[in-house]
Amino acid sequence: MADVERRASDTGVAPAASKIEFELPGQDNAVGYREYVEALDLDISDREYTRVRWKLDLTILPMFLITQALQFMDKTSLNYANLFGYQEALGLQGRDFNYLSAMVYAGYFFGQYPCGWLIGRFPAQRVIAISILLWGVMVLLMTQSQSYSSALAVRFFMGIFEAAVTPGLTLMTGFWYTRREIPLRQCIWYSSLGWGGIIGSYISMGVSKLPEDMTPERWELIFYILGGATCLWAFVIWFVLPDAPSNARFLTHRERLIAVKRVAGNETGIKNKAFSKDQVRVGFMDPKTILLFISVFAAAIPNGVVNSFSTIIIRDMGFTTTKTTQLKSVGDAVQIVALIIGGTIILNVPNSRLLTATAANLLCTIAAACMAYLPSSNTWGRLISFWLVNSQSVGFTVSLTTISSNMAGYTHRSLASAMVLYVTHLFLPALFTVLTAYCWGNFAGPFVVNQSEAPHFTGATIGLLVGYAIKLGCHLLLLAYMFTINRSRDKLYGPANKEASDEAGMRDLTEFENRDFRYVL
């Protein structure tokens, strides 16, 4: 990593002039670069700035939130179908249901690279819309999968098609919002997991009121409802969601320039269609990527438990099917509240991202310890602890914002995201690193659940405790690393030149090539 820093210091970045009339490397492939140059002399009033931000919040944010909510409900639809005899209908035995739950993440693994390449090469909203339509079809096909092997195949392809969504939305959040705005907005659209859980619980509650001998069967209705809604939503994304501020039809030309100038201040650029081999090496050598990979993998194991087996764990505490769906929605509400509180703190308290994540991780660790060591007779104590582990989403969201706010260079961000989120391929750095850890952690999660351990589920609760403890340690190390780099750069180069750093970001330089870049803690 030191040699990367040395080359960065030799390169330097010239301060941005009022007009740039010479060729700069990477500008032809950098989305929004021409608008950035045009906007350099733009005089923007506070009123215009606020109006553009509100337009983005009222247009972009709801689409992100609904897309992520549908993905979550579709991915965890087995959790609800299982309440209505899905295992019995397919004749599942032993760990068959565990493999079926995990198979979607194996699909993520193989789908991440092609989806990441497509998002970088073509309009992101087109790729995401097609992905949404295809995974919606897979959800509908679950009703026609009358054998274990066919259901496994459908779940695998569902994972492939879903692989574009979370990394795509994470990258696109950085296209639209400033570094200060990203955490709260990311927390808002990621709170869709909680909203999706609540909606899914009440859909299940409604289905539970229907006759048990009806046709189609009640578990089939779950897939019909969720799959149909997803297919319809794909058309909304295709026709309404823009790829980047520079081509947003709901903005005027001047508003597009303002939107591009806003995110130029992130020092990370918007999007670059060219693949950078140099950024691949940087991505794999980046200590941030490594720490995020470990933390997300560790936390994804308990996440796989909660997503796939929450209804079973709550039901085996002694509650009816209807009561189980109601109680599960409380945990989803905890997730929403934790994300909004965490995002608000980060927005208003400078350099509080990782400290906020640490507080949430500590709460999860304590809650997991209570689940592991409280006696089975203490039903409500264990249930409240199970609700509280949903606050782990704060730490995961901070991991995503670390990529969108603290990693420059489009290929670099993409690789890190893939490695951390669902796992993707070895060529697109940061985002894909995170997605890789997320994928395999969630794949492993269902296998720490053993039905014979009900109602205490010792293996699952110990898995929760260990996973959250590792995540807590990684976030503390990440905080120490970025703080040290900021301080050493200030000593070596003096105060950062903000204009030069903005220019470097729009040219798709990484944070290691841009000596004026400072991490947001």
Task: Pin down the residues of each PLM region.
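Extracytoplasmic gate region of multi-pass secondary transporters
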Residues: N79, D278-G343, L400-T401, L428-P429, ...
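Intracellular terminal tails of multi-pass secondary transporters
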Residues: M1-L70, G94, W238-K273, P455-L521
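Glycine-rich segments within core transmembrane alpha-helices of 12-TM secondary carriers
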Residues: P183-P216, Y224-T230, S417-G445
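Residue-level signature of mid-helix packing/kink "hotspots" within the transmembrane helices
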Residues: T76, Y105-Y113, A163, G197-I198, ...
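Helix-breaking motifs and short loop linkers at transmembrane-helix boundaries and internal kinks
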Residues: D74, L90-G91, P114, F122-P123, ...
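Conserved MFS/SLC helix-loop-helix module at the cytosolic interface between two early adjacent transmembrane helices
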Residues: F109-S149
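Helix-to-loop junctions at the C-terminal end of transmembrane segments
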Residues: F110-P123, A338-S352
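C-terminal ends and interior cores of transmembrane alpha-helices
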Residues: L133-Q146, L362-S376, N390
